[in-house]
Amino acid sequence: MSSFTMYTTPWCGYCHRLKSQLDREGISYDIVDIEQVPDAALIVEQANGGNQTVPTLVYSDGTAQTNPSLAQVKEKIASLG
């Protein structure tokens, strides 16, 4: 089971980079393309003050990070226990 969902778009370079880093580390996550899932865009907007900024990660505890580094993601996952 993944501890977070990554909201992304196909053209987002930062998203591709973070996905590659997570995959190399063997970190599992769910992925949602906000251009294909309109309700997902609303989630991203709520996490980013009305902006559709990606990548936005939403964790199992309801918190979010926008364009985090791999280290920030690993730290957050560790804090979730």
Q: Model regions: which residues?
A:
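Thiol-based oxidoreductase modules, predominantly thioredoxin-like and allied folds used
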Residues: 27-41
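Short, charge-rich, low-complexity interaction segments located
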Residues: 42-46
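Residues at alpha-helix termini
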Residues: 25, 47-48, 80
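Non-catalytic, surface beta->alpha helical segment in thiol-disulfide oxidoreductase systems
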Residues: 59-81
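Structural micro-motif
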Residues: 48-58
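Alpha-helical coiled-coil heptad-repeat segments used for dimerization/assembly
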Residues: 17-20, 39, 75
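Local sequence-structure signature of Cys/Sec-based thiol-disulfide redox active-site neighborhoods
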Residues: 1-27
